[in-house]
Amino acid sequence: MPDNLPEAYNAVEWNNPDHEVLVCFASSWSDNGLETWAFALPTILVPFTGTGDFLSALVAAWYDPSASSNGMSPLATAVSKALLAVQQILLRTHIHALAQVTDTNDATADDVKSKAQVLRKRELRIIPERSLITEGGEGWPGSRVDWSNWA
């Protein structure tokens, strides 16, 4: 896990030892062989919709076969930037949803109507947080995977 996570990650208790970590891999093949990068991200254990489509769209938008950053392949660079934007938007969406909770039942809804209301509060805040996409950033830190020791 990166050392310098935003302070707001305390809102999701990412540093809890029982907390799940999501690992994303970006692999590409070139004349030099297989290159794989791994990115470890803290999970936000609440439902969101559209995250896969959003991540895919950002990777496609930022993929440039002639660009690389920090020794990463072009694909790993695009994935790194997309992961940073998605993580930041998910975190801000979650914090916004927490601020909208009006009673304890909002956080753990059981019936269909309540679940729909909870999900509406967790719609990705892409437009309000669009500066995270347009201004970009360096990207989410990753590590190159060495497959040479794997049999």
Describe the predicted segments one by one:
Residues 1-49, 83-86, 90-97:
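Conserved phosphate-donor
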Residues 12, 35, 60, 138, ...:
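Short, low-complexity intrinsically disordered segments
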Residues 15, 30, 63, 141, ...:
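Short linear interaction motif-like sites in intrinsically disordered regions of transcription factors
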Residues 19, 50, 54, 73-81:
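Conserved active-site and cofactor/substrate-binding residues in soluble primary-metabolism enzymes
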Residues 37, 58-59, 80:
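A broad "ordered helical/assembly scaffold" signature
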Residues 41, 61, 76-77:
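PLP-dependent amino-acid enzyme catalytic core
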Residues 48-71:
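Short, small-residue alpha-helix embedded
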Residues 70-151:
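Charged C-terminal helix
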